[in-house]
Structure formats: C-alpha cells, structure tokens
Regions:
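Glycine-/small-residue-enriched transmembrane alpha-helix faces in small-molecule transporters
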Residues: 1-31, 43, 146-173, 193-197, ...
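Specific transmembrane alpha-helical segments of multi-pass solute transporters/efflux pumps
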Residues: 8-9, 13-14, 42-99, 135, ...
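Juxtamembrane helix-entry segments on the extracytoplasmic side of multipass membrane proteins
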Residues: 23-27, 31, 59-65, 138-161, ...
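Transmembrane alpha-helices of multi-pass small-molecule transport proteins
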Residues: 23-78, 103-105, 162-170, 184-204, ...
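Helix-helix packing/entry segments at the starts of transmembrane helices
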Residues: 30-32, 76, 80, 94-101, ...
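Hydrophobic transmembrane alpha-helices of multi-pass small-molecule transport proteins
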Residues: 41, 109, 118-140, 252, ...
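Intrinsic disorder in cytosolic terminal tails and internal cytosolic loops
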Residues: 56, 292-305
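Cytoplasmic-side transmembrane-helix entry/capping segments in multi-pass membrane proteins
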Residues: 64-68, 118-131, 178-187
Length: 305
C-alpha cells in the first residue's frame, strides 16, 4: 500500500510542480522544496539513529564527500532545474510521460558506465520506450520532426531522466557505504546549498515567498513532504520488504497517476499522440524492468519528480 501511495505522490509532483512554477520561478520553488525536505529528513535521521543508540554516519575523506555532493548536484540541483523549468513550458501530462523513460535510460547508462548486463529484452523495451517518447515530443507529427519545431519544455524535460540516471548510477557506490535515508538526506542538503544561490541569482530568493498563493504553498509542501520525504522513506521501505525487482514494477504507476491527476486537477486533456506515446513508454519500460532485473534485495533507483 505504501508503494502505491508513493507512486501516487510522485505522480502528483508533476501537477504540484506545474502549479508552483506558474506562481514562482523554478529555482525558488526547488530551493524551498528541498530546504523544507532537508530539515525534515535530517530530523528523521537524527531521531532514528538516536533511537538505535548509533551515531549518524559522516563521510570520511574527500572521495566520500565528493560522492555525496555529486548526488546533490545530479539528483537535486540538475534534475529539478530541468524538471521545473521544463514544466514552465510544457504540460504536466507530457512531463510525466517523458520522465517515465527514466528506468530504461538508467539501464543503458549502467551498461555503458558500470558494465552491467543489458539483455535483449531490455533492448526491445528501450526501443519501444524511445518510440513512445518520440511520439510525445513530436505530438505524433512528422512535420514537427522535419521542422524541428519542438516544445522547449519537452526538450528540457528530456534532461530529467538523464540527470536521474546519473544520480542512480553515482548513488550505487554511495549506497554501498551509507544507509539510503542518510544518503538521501546528504543529497538534499547539498542540493539545497546549490539551489539557494541559484535562486538568489534568479532574483527570487526573497520575492518568491510573496508570489505564492495558498495553492502555491500547498504545491510546494506536496513536493517537499509527500514527493520527497514520505516518497523516499516509503520507497526504500518497500525495497527492503519486497526486493528491488518487485518494487521497481510499481514505478510504472507514476506516469498513470501523473496523467490522471493532471486531468483532474489541471484540466489537461489527453490527445491521441500522448495516449499512444504514453502506452509505448509504459509498456517498454515495463518490459525492460521485468526482463532486466534480478530478483534480489537491495537499493534500487527511484523515479521521482
């Protein structure tokens, strides 16, 4: 049940993000989101380790600190830059369908970078998912492809799966030494430290607070409390209970919830190209996920917004 709710929360981040950047600049929204999340995550980390009578793990040496910083740079700073800036230009529906390509891109980069096995069934799933993303980005129009008149938000959103794939790959080495909750807390902390000066350069660090309406604040709190804190905690609890491969199957619910919530809350319509592309993406990712993961316990890369 927690995993289903986690996918619901992550699907909701596309709606919350779209609403929030409609009221305040992207870097401000991201900085506020992770400032709130960092405080809550570190409070949770301190409480859990104190309850067990243990000290909170601290990176030892330059390599481990660099590893933690790289998680904040890729999974928090870069991801949220392209995610929220992309949502300023494109629909929450398109965003949720494009980001759903994430697991397949992670598998490809893992094969190239970490020399992990990439099975033929994964290659088939990759082709289907790529085709689906292409249909969504081009709106099913050959004319768009020929003229290269793509929506800039869709192109930016393509960077989100790449940033998250890098985060997942870099995180494998970090997770070998640190508990997932601790690694996530460090990533959020470093990401916040990067986002705050970016928001200041954006000129929104102080003015952004006054731009948010009640609904804007609700959106930011959804991103921080549900999409980040509850989402990550419950995700890793699900991985520990079911194993990485079984938990990964639930990820396919994220775009479905994203599209549904975009329609219900933002009144976004789903056209034929989005429906066809979305089916191809979800089906392709599903094939690749089921065919490419061994049924083992351990940490798995999540898909978030």
């Amino acid at each position: 049940m927690k995993l289903v709710l986690t996918m619901f929360f992550w699907g909701g981040t596309f709606v919350a993000g779209k609403w929030a950047v409609g009221e305040a600049p992207p870097f401000f929204v991201a900085a506020l989101r992770f400032a709130i999340a960092s405080v809550l995550l570190w409070t949770l980390v301190a409480w859990r380790f104190r309850e067990r009578g243990n000290r909170v793990p601290v990176p030892a040496g330059w390599a481990q600190w660099t590893g933690m910083f790289s998680l904040g740079l890729t999974g928090v700073f870069l991801y949220n830059f392209v995610f929220l800036t992309g949502l300023s230009w494109t629909s929450a529906t398109n965003g949720s369908l494009i980001v759903a390509f994430n697991p397949m891109l992670t598998a490809v980069l893992s094969a190239l970078w970490l020399k992990e096995r990439f099975r033929p069934v994964q290659a088939g799933g990759l082709l289907l998912a790529l085709l689906g993303v292409g249909v969504v980005v081009t709106r099913g129009s050959i004319a768009v492809m020929r003229s290269l008149s793509f929506n800039p938000g869709d192109l930016l959103m393509l960077g989100a799966p790449l940033a998250w794939a890098l985060y997942t790959i870099l995180g494998k080495k970090v997770l070998a030494r640190f508990p997932p909750l601790v690694a996530t807390a460090y990533a959020c902390l470093f990401g916040t430290l990067l986002l705050l000066p970016a928001a200041a350069l954006e000129g929104s660090l102080l003015s952004g607070v006054h731009r948010l309406t009640v609904y804007g604040w609700i959106s930011v709190l959804q991103l921080a409390l549900l999409g980040t804190v509850a989402g990550f905690v419950w995700w890793y609890e699900g991985v520990e209970m079911l194993g990485a491969s079984r938990a990964a199957v639930f990820v396919n619910l994220v775009p479905l919830f994203g599209v549904l919530l975009s329609s219900l809350i933002l009144s976004e319509s789903l056209d034929v190209s989005q429906l066809a592309g979305g089916i191809l993406v979800v089906f392709g990712v599903g094939i690749g996920t089921l065919g490419g993961r061994e049924d083992r316990d351990g940490a798995a890369g999540a898909v978030t917004g």
